[in-house]
Amino acid sequence: MEQIILNILKALRCGETVDDKALVKLIHAEARREGADKRDLAKRRLLPFYQRVKREDPARWAAWNVDSDLERQLLQVLRMKPRRTASGVATITVITKPWPCSGDCLFCPNDLRMPKSYLHAEPACARAEQNCFDPYLQVSARLTALSQMGHATDKIELIVLGGTWSDYPQGYQTWFMSELFRALNDDAVAGVAANPMLARPGISRAEAGRLLDDAPADALPPVVAERRERYRAAGIAIDEAELAAGVADEQERVDAAVGGYNRAVRRLYGPGTPWGEVTEWQTATMEELERQQHINETAKHRVVGLVIETRPDAVTPQALTLIRRLGCTKIQMGIQSLDQYLLDINERRISVGQIERAFSLARLFGFKIHAHFMLNLLGATPEGDKRDYERFMTEGAFMPDEVKVYP
């Protein structure tokens, strides 16, 4: 791997352009020379290798004679998914734990391994599950990944997903936000040795989660090591087979329309379960959150945006006051339709009037609004969807700052 780095540096010193195509050629040539698997020399492994040498073997790194300008060019070559932070802001998405939902929309999936409306196979959800839905662990994992991909992480937008935020107890809301800030303030970036995805080609995310538990102690930030041990001691599973088996019976009943999502979630995650034990310490005071927010003002990774998810009927002055104190700057709001007939037959249990009021209140409190809109709902027609969407984007009572359209 060192030879590839040296070849890149040589090309850059000669003024050559090393784009992805040129980099692939360098990797393939070195793989043939060494008789190695190309995957072992993949681009995603090069930057962590460079970072590790610079940090742990300064004499070796000094021999490469890399000045600041050359390093800047090298990092541009090695950076993974460069568009991800093209705006200068790195986005970190985290997921809250499964919890009863105040809604019962017809179109929402009922995956008992996830908060309502989410599916465990989605990338962010899979990462959250492997990190026990813990905000500190999720932020640490994403900070580590972004760092190892070569992205700047001085400005962070946190996106908190998981259904209706206000459905969670206030103590949990405060704890969750406090831990997000704490992870950023602690600079909770793990070492390369704690990333099994870099150590073995083709490894699954589930297997990576298991191997992470065996990572060297000095490769993990202290709070990460302590927190993972705490969940393990409580009996919280991260193994794919255990996770699937743990909800199988309840999932079968929910899929058969027996009992419902909320009842099943209470049985799986409520008092008397491992998650019930964990819930007892997942709480914090507003003073602790404000302390972490104050520290973050001068931290290495500063929060410049914080997003939560809610429903129009949960948008009240009291809820918005709390959300503002928690540090939020933007609200993701599930609108789905402005056709009252469609809202009713899809069991949204909200009115167009409530949607208008939610928009008005959110603007009054200074929040940006990221709206969700759905096409092809039960009872919808293409013509009706078009009229509905045009109204949503042109009528003054609505006109969100951002919109996500679901098919």
Set out the residue ranges of the language-model regions.
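Conserved, mostly hydrophobic/aromatic
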Residues: 105, 160, 308, 323, ...
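Conserved C-terminal portion of the radical SAM core fold
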Residues: 326-330, 353-407
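Active-site-adjacent "gating/activation" loops or surface patches in catalytic cores
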Residues: 313, 318-344
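Active-site mouth loops of central-metabolism enzymes
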Residues: 96, 303-315, 378-383
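Alpha-helix-loop-beta-strand connector modules within alpha/beta enzyme cores
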Residues: 180, 184-185, 231, 285-300, ...
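Active-site-proximal loop/turn and secondary-structure-junction residues that shape catalytic pockets
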Residues: 162-166, 310-314, 337-339, 373-379, ...
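Flexible, acidic/Gly-rich N-terminal and inter-domain linker regions that tether
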Residues: 1-138, 142-281
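Aromatic/hydrophobic pocket-lining residues that form the small-molecule binding cavity
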Residues: 139, 173, 316, 355, ...
